Amino acid sequence: SDLWVQKMKTYFNRIDFDKDGAITRKDFESMATRFAKESEMKPEHAKVLMDSLTGVWDKFLANVAGGKGIDQATFISSMKEKVKDPNAKAVVEGPLPLFFRAVDTNEDNMISRDEYGIFFNMLGLNPDMAPASFDAIDTNNDGLLSQEEFVTAGSDFFINDQDSPNKVFWGPLV
């Protein structure tokens, strides 16, 4: 769907950390490093996050890249095929609990509105955009995101090609 393509363009934009128009393993490494540093993540958690994010590259994208970066059009066509894989949901969900841990800076097993603003800041987005996304994925409207809500929203972003509140998980669509 056009919406799914727009979501993939949004994600591509968020993970192209060096903004060179291509995603590489280095972008995933940079994302993990920034999240670990800005959330003051414990070293053992930082290693798991790094392994998980580079694992997304290794499992999903390295064969597409062929030793170089992946441009947006190639990324989108590859993801169209990848999400059809029966293991896609598990691979997509893999790093999400680690992102959750990175964003849950006070380690209370919930993400507050303020902590979600930190998530947006880590992605290079204006934290002022976070409340609208937060409210959209706070499915039980308790003002907090559980790990289940966070992982479900993040996974749905990639897997679901229909309109849903989770389309704003990675921020406003580009």
Curated annotation (Swiss-Prot):
The entry lists its GO molecular-function terms as: calcium ion binding
Report whether Acetylation shows up as a keyword of the record.
yes
Q: Where is the EF-hand domain?
A: 3-38, 55-90, 91-126, 125-160
InterPro entries reported for this sequence: EF-hand-dom_pair, EF_Hand_1_Ca_BS, EF_hand_dom
Q: Which residues bind Ca(2+) 1?
A: D16, D18, D20, D27
- Positions of Ca(2+) 2 binding: D104, N106, D108, M110, E115
Which cystines does this chain contain?
A: none
> Per UniProt, which keywords does this protein have?
Acetylation, Calcium, Metal-binding, Muscle protein, Repeat
Pfam families tied to this protein: EF-hand_5
Q: Which positions in this protein are listed as binding Ca(2+) 3?
A: D138, N140, D142, E149
PROSITE patterns for this protein: EF_HAND_1, EF_HAND_2
N-acetylserine found at: S1
Q: What is the protein's known function?
A: Like parvalbumins, SCPs seem to be more abundant in fast contracting muscles, but no functional relationship can be established from this distribution.
**Miscellaneous comment:** The sarcoplasmic calcium-binding proteins are abundant in the muscle of arthropods, mollusks, annelids, and protochordates.
| Protein name, UniProt field | Sarcoplasmic calcium-binding protein
Organism the protein comes from = Perinereis vancaurica tetradentata
* Origin organism lineage: Eukaryota, Metazoa, Spiralia, Lophotrochozoa, Annelida
